[in-house]
Amino acid sequence: KGTLHFLADSTISRPSLDSEHLHRTAALWCSSPITRIDTLHSLDQWIPFAELKKEMPIYKIYFADDAGTQLYLSSQNGEALQFSNRSERFWAWLGAIPHWVYFTWLRQDTVLWTKTVIWLTALGCLMVIAGIWVTVDVWRKTHRSRHPKFSPYRKRWYHWHYVSGIFFGIFVLTFTFSGMMSLADIPEWIHKPALKKGSATRTLHARAPQPEDYPLDYRRVIAAYPQALQIEWRNFREHPYYIVKDRKNEYYIDAADSLPRPLQLSEEEILKGVESIYTSQRDSSQHIPGIRISRLEHFETYYRDMSNMYRGRPQLPVWKITVDDPDRSVYYIHPETGIIRHVDTSSRWKYWSYTALHRMRLPGLNSNATLRKTVLWVLLLGGTAVCITGVALSVNYIRRKCCKRQKRY
């Protein structure tokens, strides 16, 4: 057992990562000279994930370029773990890190991080609900008077917190709740899946041939794609293929032949693959559920455009396989990439409680990226106004309390 590493141009086992191999790998990512290499024995802000501890020590490479480029390489196999520049790290501090609470000491403990985010967002939901309750009560009392005003508050921060809360309070609540649901599982009392989580995908990726049994030699792939930075061995059931990645693109190469050509899974092998999920799960007393396959030429609610995730690669047409099982399963399998999306009742609940509310992936907006982003920007700016005015009121309240306490003494 274990992992074997080979040189890309031979079948000779590669020794442990040495200086020459490290510098050669780094040059693939950035052509600038290396100014410093740090050997890390603990995680830092840009590699905060616990699963990376097995890659220790990790080499952090600094490049002499104006962009402030940094590269993290595993000492175990030379794999690139992180690649970033100064601008990306700056925006991460303003975006991903506070949004996801990606602080190293917390994020490296996955269980603690998950519970922390769930509890913080749950507390946030309670706070927003309380604010909406107060807003409704004030609105009701204000409009009972003889001379009703839109806002009863004269003080600036109170006025703008009240006004922004009226327009954006519900969005702040749904955004906070959906953020919690990004990590929380759908309770089994709502729906208990008939298939174990991930079992369908594991079945479709089972029966993989050994790397040395791929008809297409990986060295021929390297020769055809000299700009490649990474090659992955993949399979759809018995059908082998490679994923070749360079700096900007991904290429899916059929490995069932001795000559490189784009992957194209047939309708028959996709249908047989889905059938295998249910033949492997059933016992002798059970029947295989009804399965229907159709060719989808357009995006729909549960199969949306995710071009950014797949480096702009076209995701249509796709095979849609509908199964008459207790989970109301639908499989979307892209023949040119082998990418599988499995939708069942639980994932539909997840979609409406997280994706739809948090990313505005709603019918009518999914098909128009510009409109969706515009709506999202307006709502996020409004939600930011609610938060900023709320924080200002809280700071002013604490300041007044501290001043009163000082006067007493």
Regions found by a protein language model. Name each.
Residues K1-Y409:
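Conserved histidines in hydrophobic membrane contexts and catalytic metal-binding motifs
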